[in-house]
A protein has these predicted regions:
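Histidine-anchored nucleotide/phosphate-binding helix
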Residues: 65-72, 205-212, 219-221, 346-354, ...
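N-terminal basic/disordered segments at the start of proteins
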Residues: 1-21, 132-215, 300-301, 311-316, ...
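Feature captures the catalytic cores and cofactor-binding loops of soluble hydro-lyases/lyases
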Residues: 3-127, 229, 449-528
Length: 564
């Protein structure tokens, strides 16, 4: 049995063992350390002060920010023990130690050691030993993992020596620590970045950004930024508390002061100048990463928050993960029994289920050939997959550009039946039949999606609040009458913020149940908002907006319809 030290530190505490990965952002309350992911078996459990074991993290790149906030708030786990290589929470713990002096030990255990430690009641971590207490006690030596020193260019050494300023030097230190953990042989140039940590999900995001900005940080590559937590132009009319709005604006201003483009969108693939196939980029935001790799054929790992900024400040990234050809090959094959006459709800359903079945490997999806998905369908499958898996991409046979890559020799094969899809639909529909809010735009809605919604409403006025979050560029493109039609129908078009960053009172406070077409928000929404969620197609959402009633299980998933 083996266990190795990834980040140093000592600690002890009762064990919280998970067999399913967890997204720290959207899955853990940063103020208490309680698990809030309603879909996770550990929901309601406290992580603070406990030795937390899990195979890997999953989902959001923003988990690093949550991990840092937990450390700053004094409610972090006593230690983290992973069974597999993990970047997101590890990066948050690295920043907590390196920048703020709040270390959280991170360890990796081999399969047998992980299983044995998971059965312990409590664990103690010393400088060189891990000791598990309980009915089946175990003591293991802690080894140092092989961490080859990456080769540095003269430019890398100059940045590290401070020739580009203290912020870039700190950024290079972080990059090199991660490069060693990822066993990267060298750093590579990247052409563009997308920074994720612009949402005021916690004070750690603001503290980190303002600290780097105060050090004179400036990005070296074109860098867009994610959605923020307020509509910058209209927050006062929306009743947002000035203190919160001011902090959200400060966070956005810190990034723009560092030279980032004020794009304020979680869908950077809807901006102009898309990345090209094979282009080495450095994006964070899980849905954007999965879309860039899967649909565009660009190359970017799922960079954790804060590492994304460090890369933007240097233009350099560790040569690891899906930057490499071998890491893009399928490690899992899913045969989908695609229903006849399925609507657009199929794609987020498949993405959600694919992530659960392939939590840490790039999957190849077969059985969807000939369905001719739209870019909105592909956006939906990528967003849902990026929520339930740690993998940064997937392949769809006959659809995506690298689906021809041969699966790895030991790639497992799974059949996904229509009953599996029906059960996935049920798992995302825990809310009541009556809904009092319709949520569109997670990720940010496209021009096509807004036009479809206007057409589905067909001049009728909504009976429950209906909000579409999207980017400023999309709203500017809706001058063909779509924006006016949605406004007349009573639909709110909100720029800058997104559903994953929306808070009361912009999120209507009296809401009890929400209808959405987003597999991502159907998963995260209960934990983020405290409300029940219903999921369906865009047509289902339009009908819910007009009637206040959520749709039932669609006909194309009903067993009686399939056997008729």
């Amino acid at each position: 049995m083996t266990a190795s030290r990834i980040l140093p530190g000592t600690g002890r505490g009762p064990v919280l063992a998970m067999q399913t990965g967890l997204s720290f952002w959207g899955g853990v309350d940063p103020d208490s350390g309680r698990v809030i992911d309603a879909q996770h078996p550990a929901c309601g459990q406290a992580m603070a002060g406990r030795v937390v074991l899990m195979p890997n993290s999953r989902g959001s790149c923003s988990g690093s920010g949550t991990m840092l906030e937990l450390a700053l708030n004094g409610c972090a786990p006593a230690a983290l023990i992973f069974a597999e290589p993990e970047d997101v929470a590890t990066l948050g713990a690295l920043i907590a130690a390196l920048v703020f002096g709040r270390p959280v030990p991170v360890l990796r255990a081999g399969p047998k050691a992980f299983a044995r430690l998971s059965r312990c009641d409590s664990i103690e971590i010393t400088e060189d030993t891990i000791i598990g207490h309980g009915a089946d006690p175990v003591t293991l030596p802690l080894t140092e993992p092989a961490q080859p020193e990456p080769a540095l260019s003269s430019g890398d050494r100059a940045i590290l020596a401070g020739e580009a300023g203290p912020a870039a030097a700190l950024a290079m230190q972080v990059i090199l620590r991660m490069a060693r953990l990822q066993a990267a042989s060298r750093l590579i140039d990247v052409t563009r970045g997308h920074v994720d940590g612009t949402i005021l999900a916690n004070q750690a995001n603001l503290i980190f950004a303002e600290k780097l900005a105060a050090m004179g940080a400036q990005v070296r590559i074109p860098t867009t930024i994610n959605a923020i937590s307020v509509d910058r132009q209209n927050w006062q009319q929306q009743g947002v508390p000035p203190v919160f709005a001011g902090q959200a604006a400060r966070l956005a201003d810190a990034y723009t002061a560092m030279g980032c483009r004020p794009s304020f969108t979680c869908a950077p693939y809807q901006l102009d100048d898309l990345p090209k196939a094979g282009e080495m980029i450095a994006w964070a935001e899980s849905n954007a990463v999965v879309y860039a790799n899967t649909v565009l054929g660009a190359r970017t790992p799922k960079h954790p928050d804060y590492l994304d900024l460090c890369i933007a400040l240097t233009g350099r990234a560790p040569l690891a993960g899906v930057y490499l050809d071998a890491a893009r090959r399928p490690g899992c094959v899913l045969q989908i029994d695609a229903p006849n006459a399925a609507d657009d709800a199929l794609w987020p359903l498949v993405g959600h289920l694919a992530g659960l079945l392939s939590p840490d490997a790039v999957p190849l999806l077969r059985g969807l050939e000939g369905l001719n998905p739209s870019t909105d369908d592909l956006r939906a499958i990528c967003a849902a997959f990026g929520t339930t898996s740690a993998a940064p991409m997937l392949h769809v046979a006959g659809v995506t550009p690298e689906a021809h890559l041969p699966p790895l020799p030991d790639a497992p094969h799974h059949a996904v039946s229509r009953d599996d899809l029906a059960r996935a639909w049920q798992s995302l529909n825990h809310g009541p039949d009556r809904v009092d809010l319709v949520a569109i735009g997670s990720p940010h809605a496209s021009v096509r999606e807004c036009r479809r919604l206007a057409a589905l409403l067909d001049g009728q006025r909504v009976q429950v609040p209906t909000i579409v979050t999207t980017g400023r560029g999309v709203i500017a493109a809706l001058t063909d009458g779509t924006a006016e039609a949605l406004h007349k129908a009573g639909v709110q078009l909100l720029p800058d913020l997104c559903w994953c960053s929306m808070t009361e009172p912009v999120f209507p406070p009296d809401t009890t149940a929400v209808m959405t077409n987003s597999g991502k928000y159907a998963h995260y929404g209960p934990g983020l908002s405290g409300r029940k969620l219903r999921f369906g197609s865009l047509r289902d959402c339009a009908q819910a907006a007009l009637t206040g009633r959520a749709a039932d299980l669609p006909d194309w998933l009903r067993a009686d319809e399939r056997t008729a």
